[in-house]
Amino acid sequence: MVLVDTSIWISHLRDNRPALVELLNQVSVACHPFVTGELALGNLKNRREILTSLERLPTSEIATHQEVLEFIEARALMGKGLGLIDIHLLASAKLSSIPFWTQDQRLLKAVTDLGIDYSET
């Protein structure tokens, strides 16, 4: 199972990423409600179909507000240019013990530092 970041989904919806298609076919993709929410804010072709498909994917564990605050402190994630949604996704991947796939450079550094990075190979 892999938690897939919004940046990967956007890339996939524009250009079709074969590695993501393979993971989807293997039922190995987890989603987070914040990723679905971020995508819902964009202009999507086949909007309802895409959002419904995302909602049908397995969901990663969802960190509570308190867990996120503790996660920030425990891993010294303040001042790294990450947003609250980024931290929620990192915490969820860590709580779920699954890798996190992103192409956002700041987020990728944090994911790599936490040892939960996913690389399409």
Regions found by a protein language model. Give the residues of each.
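Short, well-structured N-terminal submotif of metal-dependent ribonuclease cores
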Residues: 1-31, 40-52, 119
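A generic, residue-level signal for flexible/boundary positions that often mark functional hotspots
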Residues: 7, 54, 76-79
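Active-site neighborhoods of divalent-metal-dependent phosphate/nucleic-acid chemistry enzymes
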Residues: 12, 18, 59-121
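Amphipathic alpha-helical segments within well-ordered protein domains
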Residues: 36-40, 51-55, 69, 73, ...
